[in-house]
């Protein structure tokens, strides 16, 4: 599921990834949510508490489906935008590719 934020991970800098693109599965309706962050644990906690986004707030609970390490925030925003343009089937294939 979630890659280790260790140095050497794809997109990792000396202290680990500078940013993450993540996909959440909303268990209420099995929808997928894509976002980016520089602090994955904090962002997941926000989503799970209902403070993350309007979209996930109404579809709790959520689970992390995939997390992709990114070298910087700009790369994370671009990858988020690219993933948001994918079809559901393409997003599910991307999730299935993750370790």
Q: Where would I find each of the regions flagged by the language model?
A:
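GIY-YIG nuclease catalytic motif and its immediate N-terminal context
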Residues: 1-84, 88-99
């Amino acid at each position: 599921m979630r890659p280790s934020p260790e140095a050497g991970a794809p997109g990792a800098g000396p202290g680990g990834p500078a940013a993450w693109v993540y996909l959440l599965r909303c268990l209420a309706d099995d929808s997928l949510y894509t976002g980016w962050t520089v602090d994955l644990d904090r962002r997941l906690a926000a989503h799970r508490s209902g403070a993350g986004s309007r979209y996930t707030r109404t579809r709790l609970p959520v689970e992390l489906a995939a997390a992709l390490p990114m070298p910087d925030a700009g790369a994370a925003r671009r990858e988020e935008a690219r993933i948001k343009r994918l079809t559901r089937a393409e997003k599910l294939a991307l999730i299935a590719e993750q370790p």
